[in-house]
Amino acid sequence: MSEPKPIQDTLDRRHSRESSISSASTTSLVFDRLAEESEKNHDASSRPHPSAARHAYTDDNSDAIKESDINDPETGPFLGASSETTPPRKGVDRKLKKVLLIVGGFFVAAWIVSLVVFLTNKSYKHGSQIDHDPAATNRKSGKRVTLDQVQSGFWRPTSHTFSWIPGPDGEDGLLLEQEARGKHFLVVEDVRSQGSADGEAHPDAAESRTLIKDPWFYWGDQQHSILQTWPSKNQKKVLVATQKQRNWRHSFTALYWVFDVESQSAEPLDPAHPEERVQLATWNAQSDAIVFTRSNNLFLRKLADDKVTPITTDGGPEYFYGIPDWVYEEEVFSGNSATWWSADGKHVAFLRTNETEVPEYPIQYFVSRPSGAEPEVGEENYPEVRQIKYPKVGSPNPVVDLLFYDVEKGDVFTVDIDGDFPEKDKLINFVMWADGNVLVKTTNRVSDVLQVNLIDIVARTGKTVQHVDVAKIDGGWFEISHVMYIPADPKNGRPHDGYVDTVIHNDGDHLAYFTPMDNPKPVYITEGPGWEVDGSASAVDLKNNLVYFRSTKESSIQRHIYSVHLNGTDMKPFTDTTHESYYDVSFSSGAGFGLLSYQGPKVPWQKVVSTPSNPKSYERIIEENKDLTQQAKKHELPVLEYGTIKVDDVELNYVERRPPHFDKNKKYPVLFQQYSGPGSQTVTKKFAVDFQSSDGGRRTTRSPRRATGRPSATSTPTAFAIWGWSYGGFATLKTLETDAGRTFRYGMAVAPVTDWRFYDSIYTERYMRTPDLNRNGYQQTAISNTTALGANERFLVMHGVADDNVHMQNTLTLLDELDLAGVENYDVHVFPDSDHSIYFHNANRIVYDKLSNWLINAFNGEWVKVNDAKPKIES
């Protein structure tokens, strides 16, 4: 926490899309449109009478857009966040907190059996549990939510993101603001400078400091627009990026410059090669050197002169230095960096990735040319093809090892660990400097055995300090967790260095303090049982020996913030636990302040608060979303019901969204939203309206069975439909296949996995092991029973042609199997040049228009006519 965090392209925008949440879903929109059709054929008197009293709207919903990932397919303006993790991850899903085992179609079968029992017993009939009106079973008349509103962001709460930055002398409570309204382009400001709750400026607030005045600079006669910035620790220089070009989800290339704050001028990072694109650049803590990757080789630039020193020379298409390849970027680091400076600036640790044996997969672009290169003469009418090194299950993984560079001696070296995993069976999951040591977490290929290694960088020796067989603990696998270093401070009760990590304890994820560094037996800071820590520690206050974290202590669908002493005593809530709430928090570099984000169930708000670590109390509301509150009062939003359903003796959460004017005496069509992916939790108390997944501790997330959602008040199987995106698309098709039309008649699958042998090795083998070890599991999970799919009324499949994550191969292989079996009860829509998020050329709007219209036609019986087409004979 001693170095400034990189800020995003747009920091602290007042109408940020970064941390936004949807409040309406495809389902409710479809029901509204179905209601419109119904009104044409029914007398107005048959409609339920609106509620007699109007109440201020406070929605109990949990369908949120992922923070910092608005374009993610699982979390667009209609979908719930697929998981709750720190840091964010994706799905086929990349927000990975917890996981469940994919074992055949058994979890789907178990869910369907439970669903049938659930419907038969009519256990869905219960009272409303809506936060803003506990007695309400319907809403008073108002405006209807429209598809255009949701897609335009009409229902998205305004939220702000802070990039906390330590002062040059360790000052706490400083923010890095980029493009803030009415200010210079890049400013360091005390969080208290804008006043407290009474509107008065805080007397202790430090003066603002401008780092960059304008969003552009000149070099020679060329003007360059600044897109991203990274200040040095002493705040005298700023590393800036211009002309960014996206690579994969997190990675990009750009032209990099060193901007001098005093002179407000810039120079190229490599003065001898100003036009060469750089993949990654990182400051040291001394603010006098930058290490960067270019053309997959690592270089060092010391600011004392213009000289650039090559650290590696054999980088290229097969070897990567200091940056991850596709699968490590996507599944391990969730970012574009594999470079780590030591705190004293004397050493650099970096990953070497050898992709020599990794097979390639072609990504085709039929409309655009993402490379920016002009086609060869005569090839103008051919698609651009990009070959991606993509390890599918069972195929060779990239071989990775950790290298070190001694800045003073100029040599590169490795440190061997006795008993380490063989190179082809090793994954490096985490690297952290701890004074003169380096902590490295590695696992075997299938991630069920963990080793924690400790390297003495001066002696150039290392040893294993922990060896954990996760499979023996609960039959699960290793979860990637992020460690916080706790330096020794004998005067403050810490005689040795240590670290805080997330470990499995009392059937859940809990925080443990390991000290000294090589001690395998920790002090458990949190213990449960019945609740767990969400992700890793949020912050550590070294002065007061306090650890802050977010947990499920009040409820698995709530999140509150707590503090606890490093010795595991004096745990206290930081947020108000007397009300159902879902909180997130971002702490300042010294943990003296926090940006507290209330995310539901009422309309979200944000405020800056002092923490128990700060002797001076401070509070300032920065966002109330008053406009959204008024909008909610004027519109008809769904009525929500929360509850649990038992699957294999495990209680799983569900949320049922009822139409605004729900009448228990009527029958309604039902749409199930599936995600169900490993690590997913989408049933929460966040402000939003959509079906969600479940999480009830380690047992439910390690279970091979998963239930998601449940029906509204109906027992008519012909009115059941199901849909999902990515893993949810797989779950949708597997449900249709297993059910064979007995419960569900319609399904919509977007970017689905249809055979896990087509997906990447690191993600899939973590849950299913390799095909050699689990051949039956892979066969059973593949969508292959075309006869069963044909027994459904109709289903829809959509996919992006340039999907680098869930390859188009999944959908095309399924279509071939359907053709061979003569199955025709389906529709297909493909999107040229769209990746997994399906956004290219208006594609995302088309996705949701298609889902909405297709579902309306399904519930109106139109697909019955299509499936049994009759020629129109003229008389």
Curated annotation (Swiss-Prot):
Q: Where in the cell is it found?
A: Vacuole membrane
Question: Which residues span the membrane?
Answer: 99-119
Molecular function terms from GO: aminopeptidase activity; dipeptidyl-peptidase activity; serine-type peptidase activity
Which residues does the annotated region (Disordered) include?
A: 1-90, 689-715
Q: Which residues lie on this side of the membrane: Vacuolar?
A: 120-875
- What positions constitute the catalytic site? S726, D803, H836
* Cytoplasmic face residues: 1-98
Record's compositionally biased regions (Basic residues): 699-708
- Give any Gene Ontology cellular component: plasma membrane
Q: Does the keyword Translocase apply?
A: no
Q: Which residues are glycosylated?
A: N354, N567, N785
What is the protein named? Probable dipeptidyl-aminopeptidase B
Q: Which gene encodes it?
A: DAPB
